[in-house]
Every structure is written in structure tokens, then in C-alpha cells.
Amino acid sequence: IKEDLSPVAYQWLETADARSLLDWTRMNRVLPENNGIITAVRGENEKKVLFEYMLALDLKVKRGEYADFIRAITPLGVDLLEIVLEQSCDIDITRYYKRNNQRIWDKNRLVGEILDILNQKFYPFRYGPVYSAHLLEIIQKKCTDTLMVQRIQELVNIEQNVRNVAAHNIVSVTPEWIKERTGKSVDDIFWILKYVCEQVKINTRKENWNSYDSMNKRIIDELDKD
């Protein structure tokens, strides 16, 4: 296929493929320069990585890959809740984790008020992996933005209602299946995710949500030139 396309068209196709797979190293290498649509994604830029993850989730929905969409909510949820704690509650929750970027509670570091909050709900608190339900409990006790707390509660409820079923059982995950188990449509769920992202400034420009559409239009334009 490479021989049949202009270098720019092929660059864009490779960029789109790498982007949809969240392969930033490859995407950054083949990305057309100064293209006005996408800029390089660096792993240390957490908000940009999360925004690209959100766009990839939107792509899964558009492709009808609902099981993948549901499974992807869990890691994204914990990421978002950590940022909410930092920005809305002024708590760097990672201070209570084991070192080396592990999402595991550290018995020596998790002390004081945060441990008290977790013990109230999960007595006796057993440490181990960090779950969104743990972070939700802290947000409910420490954040004053009631609407944000409500949205986070909805998000964690959705995750808990569908995660285990979709992960451990052979089921056909459809929009109807999701609505039946969560009370929310796929669009509702994505709207909640977008709301949280915008509140914590993961994305501040609404047109950025159409980035994949802009990229696809550019690809079509380049292919039409060939």
C-alpha cells in the first residue's frame, strides 16, 4: 500500500493507526510536522495522555466495541479520581502509595485522616491495590464541589456494576446490556467522563473532542490528491 500513496498520505495513515493504539512512540515518529491537528504526546504529560485515552474510548463506542469501552473505564476512573483529589480537594493521594509508581497503599505512609476515612467505610481497611471506591470515599469526605462528587459517585457506580461481569464472563456487551446494568446509556456514561475531564482541565476546548474527525478528514483529503 505504501507504494501507492503519497508520502504525506502514508504518514497520516500510520499516525492514525498508532494513535488509535495509543502507541505514542510510533505516532510521534511518523506524525506530520506542524499539521494543525495533532501534536506529539509525551508520557509525562498526564493530562494529554488521558485526553487521548478518552478520544480512544470514544472511538471504541463509534466502532461498537462496547466490551472494550467498559473494560477501559476502570483504569481511566482511577486516573481521573486522583486528579480530582489533587485539584478539587488539594490532596496528593499518591503520597500514600508504595513507591515506584505502584497503585498499592503503603501501610507506613497511609496514616492519619485519610486512613480514618477509609476505615470508616472499609473497616478494617486491608490496604492492597488502590480502587476507585477507596478514592470516592475520600472525595466524598474532603471535596466541597457537590456536583463533582455526584458525578464521581455515578462513575464509580457504573464501573462497579459492569466491570466484573464484562471482565470475567462471556457476555455480549450491547448498549442495551449497559443501560440495563447501570441505568445509564453509553452516551450518558461518556458525558459523565467528559464532564469530569473538563472540570479538571484535561480538555478546555470543546472542538478538541472532534480531533479524530479532523484527522480523518485530513486523511481523506490527502488520499484524494493521489
Predicted regions and their residues:
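Charged alpha-helical initiation segments
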Residues: 1-66
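Amphipathic alpha-helical interface elements
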Residues: 43-131, 217
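Intrinsic-disorder-associated interaction segments
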Residues: 43, 74, 107, 128, ...
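Charge-enriched, short contiguous segments at helix-coil
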Residues: 141-211
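Solvent-exposed, low-complexity, intrinsically disordered
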Residues: 130-139
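Acidic, carboxylate-rich catalytic segments that either coordinate divalent cations
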Residues: 202-226
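A structural signal for well-ordered alpha-helices, especially hydrophobic packing surfaces
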Residues: 19, 54, 58-61, 77-84, ...
